[in-house]
A protein has these predicted regions:
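N-terminal leader segment of winged-helix/HTH proteins
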Residues: 1-25, 144
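Short alpha-helical "packing" element that flanks the helix-turn-helix/winged-helix DNA-binding module
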Residues: 31-35
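Short, locally clustered residues in the helix-turn-helix/winged-helix DNA-binding domain
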Residues: 36-41, 103, 131
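Alpha-helical residues within the helix-turn-helix
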Residues: 23, 53, 70-71
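C-terminal regulatory/oligomerization modules of transcriptional regulators
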Residues: 120-144
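Charged, amphipathic alpha-helical coiled-coil/dimerization segments
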Residues: 67-125
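Key DNA-contact positions within bacterial/archaeal DNA-binding proteins
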Residues: 60
Length: 144
């Protein structure tokens, strides 16, 4: 029963967050997740493979996602001068502006749909409980 409730709650909240982000800012949750990673990265640039790992996407999945962000002018692709096999994604000035606008409303939506349902002690307890679940390798430093 707990598993079913967890899955349904996750699906419902994710669906609402995604719909709001797309309607207000033209971003998917996956787009937003990539922008969060870049926003928190030193100089707002990361290796594409590191972004893929952080957002739990395959190499082809991150390529498709970054291609869309590049076409929108939010992110730019940069080559590694010392290794042609390595490429980077960097947050553009326009991407930074648009991300910051999306961030404000997205965090407010998270608070409305999730945070306001629990007091501080319950959120801490929930974080501790969910922390027991196995997670894929990812950086905790860039999560919002």
């Amino acid at each position: 029963m707990a598993w079913i409730r967890f899955l349904r709650a996750h699906a419902a909240v994710t669906r609402q967050l995604s719909a709001r982000l797309e309607a207000e800012h033209g971003l998917t949750l996956s787009d937003y997740d990539v922008l969060v990673q870049l926003y928190h990265a030193p100089d707002r640039i990361l290796r594409r493979v590191d972004i893929a790992r952080a957002v739990l996407l395959t190499a082809s999945g991150i390529t498709r996602l970054l291609d869309g962000l590049e076409r929108g002018g939010w992110v730019e692709k940069r080559a590694c001068k010392s290794d042609a096999r390595v490429s980077y994604a960097a947050l553009t000035t326009e991407g930074l502006k648009r991300f910051e606008a999306a961030r404000r409303s997205h965090l407010a939506d998270i608070e409305e749909l999730f945070g306001s349902r629990f007091d501080a002690d319950e959120r801490a307890q929930l974080a501790e409980l969910l922390g027991r679940l196995p997670l894929a390798e990812t950086s905790e430093a860039c999560s919002e």
